[in-house]
């Protein structure tokens, strides 16, 4: 009983707190005691800023772990991008979170814990990316000799962009497109990577021209200042770029991972501009020199060809010498053809005249006269036409011969001779066809004459009466008593005297004479 009362008395001397009160008192004590501290540790569990802009991670060493938070305002003021495993020195204040009885550091400033830690992280990242082939020289692209458009990824307000534009304008003015980015701080790496990807995404024929080469540039600075260009996302974007990239980050002694991933590294931004474009004055001077050498070479070449042509021309015979013999043969053939055509026409004309004289009927005579006239006209036209044709061919032949070498001329002469022979054969064939046609027509007229002649009627037993003048008597009323008549029979003629109807006198027989038939031998055959 005594012990219980003593325990009660002791408990009454200790202040009583609620959970909230003790948590608040602890929070105030921690914040008052550790209101401004610097903590060195390794970043653990870093996943980048939250959607709200705040970042939550932890600082640890080999024996303890301290939760940390960076609010959005402080995050934007960091000069580098925090990464997993990076050793840093964080400046801020300790506080507690009553809801879970945890304490944490609210970081206001943070910096890498010395260059050694950053270099170790940089070397480890360099080895890892190198094993993936991102720095392989075999995948490097060549810079275009004369780009049309240059894309520049840098800060729009620094001296770097002014130096680049000024240098390009001095050497070879062209179109420059600037993609503004932050070149320092937490967001510099993602912005540079987005700019490189954005330039590559431009279409070839879009409203914004697609650059032929990219320059990623920044002025000099410390390792922490340039840390955004060691960001893995930047290295991968530059390595995957289809547009050649020139890295111009920092001074000549500075280096970053983007220098290894780029197609070429420039010591300075001004040097990058000089690598990107040639000197226009040098190009013009080179072009003028090459043009002069080309003109001189062409002049020498033309002179050599002219001399060779003249030498070859002196070795060849003249055109008159080459054409003398073919021209003579051609003239002789033309003369023979004209004479042969004239002689042949005369022979045919005499032949037609002979046959025409043997045909007595006027119809046949007139037809033969027409045929003779047609043949004569044809004979007159053919020499003129042939002469005109030969003259035209001779003129064309001479005109072409003046431009041709000996071999084509000889070949053409041979073809002309063959053509003349063909014309000769065609002429003979045409004359033969005319003769055959006239012969057939004469035979048809002869058969027609025999059919229509009165002598064929005499063969059937009829007779024909002629008056004293030898004209046929067509009507009995035209004959008077006492008129001397002759009656022609098939085999001869009988002389009679016309008498009255009442008295008649025996007719005196007169010596009959054979009437030559059209087919008698004295007349001869037409053909």
From Swiss-Prot:
One of its GO terms (molecular function) is exodeoxyribonuclease VII activity. One of its GO terms (biological process) is DNA catabolic process. It is found in: Cytoplasm. Its EC number is 3.1.11.6. Residues 513-527 have a biased composition (Polar residues). Disulfide bonds: none annotated. One of its GO terms (cellular component) is cytoplasm. Pfam families: Exonuc_VII_L, tRNA_anti_2. Keywords: Cytoplasm, Exonuclease, Hydrolase, Nuclease. It comes from the Bacteria. Residues 499-527 are annotated as: Disordered. The keyword Cytoplasm applies. It catalyses: Exonucleolytic cleavage in either 5'- to 3'- or 3'- to 5'-direction to yield nucleoside 5'-phosphates. Bidirectionally degrades single-stranded DNA into large acid-insoluble oligonucleotides, which are then degraded further into small acid-soluble oligonucleotides. Belongs to the XseA family. NCBIfam families: xseA. This is Exodeoxyribonuclease 7 large subunit. It comes from Brucella anthropi (strain ATCC 49188 / DSM 6882 / CCUG 24695 / JCM 21032 / LMG 3331 / NBRC 15819 / NCTC 12168 / Alc 37). The gene is xseA.
